[in-house]
């Protein structure tokens, strides 16, 4: 079973995946981008240079990583529980936040091609308000090129994530990221 964890930076995806791994030590943990050697290169490049390339180039780099990730990580582990930190939903949402004129149908078709139409079984969507995001990102003390686009940008991305997950009628657990960490974990365990 493929469970995709979605949400913008700072909502607690990695924390929840780590806690779930303690509960299900047979789970395979991965992330996009960065779940493969190629993905690490893409991730590193984009975190440092996102403002230097066109939106289309950024989309295709993420799609290339997604295709490689599918072939090297997701497909070989199909029989296992796979916990994926981000998925095509993030890719589409960030792309649409950068250019709201993009066709959601085209983006979905490109992602289906990259993923051999295997979009995932369940989605955990952690949502936060502006205050929570600002506090969490400030407490980290670090920011990459994408985070430097600002809280308003991240809220726009989150809005597109919500639209995509709702429109595509996936099996989604939407959770308020301001809840206690263990309360969130309990909801996720029941969902999976």
Swiss-Prot record:
This protein's source sits in the domain of life called: Bacteria
- Gene3D superfamilies xrefs: P-loop containing nucleotide triphosphate hydrolases
The EC number(s) this enzyme carries:
2.7.4.9
Q: Name one GO biological process term.
A: dTTP biosynthetic process
UniProt KW keywords: ATP-binding, Kinase, Nucleotide biosynthesis, Nucleotide-binding, Transferase
UniProt cross-references to HAMAP family, sorted A to Z:
Thymidylate_kinase
What this protein is reported to do is described as:
Phosphorylation of dTMP to form dTDP in both de novo and salvage pathways of dTTP synthesis.
Instruction: Name it.
Output: Thymidylate kinase
* The species this protein was found in: Campylobacter fetus subsp. fetus (strain 82-40)
């Amino acid at each position: 079973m493929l469970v995709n964890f979605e949400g913008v930076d700072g909502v607690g995806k990695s924390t929840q995946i780590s806690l779930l791994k303690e509960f299900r030590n047979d789970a395979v943990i991965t992330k996009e981008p960065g779940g493969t050697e190629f993905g690490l290169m893409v991730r590193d490049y984009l975190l440092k240079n996102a403002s230097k390339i066109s939106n289309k180039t950024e989309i295709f780099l993420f799609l290339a990583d997604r295709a490689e990730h599918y072939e090297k990580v997701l497909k070989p582990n199909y029989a296992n529980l796979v916990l994926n930190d981000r998925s095509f939903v993030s890719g589409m949402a960030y792309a649409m936040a950068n250019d709201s004129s993009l066709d959601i149908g085209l983006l979905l078709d490109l992602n289906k091609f990259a993923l051999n139409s295997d979009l995932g079984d369940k989605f955990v969507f952690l949502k936060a308000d502006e205050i929570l995001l600002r506090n969490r990102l400030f407490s980290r003390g670090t920011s990459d090129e994408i985070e430097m686009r600002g809280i308003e940008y991240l809220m726009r991305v989150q809005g597109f994530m919500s639209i995509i997950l709702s429109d595509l009628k996936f099996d989604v657990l939407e959770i308020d990221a301001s809840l206690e960490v263990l309360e969130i974990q309990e909801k996720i365990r029941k969902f999976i």
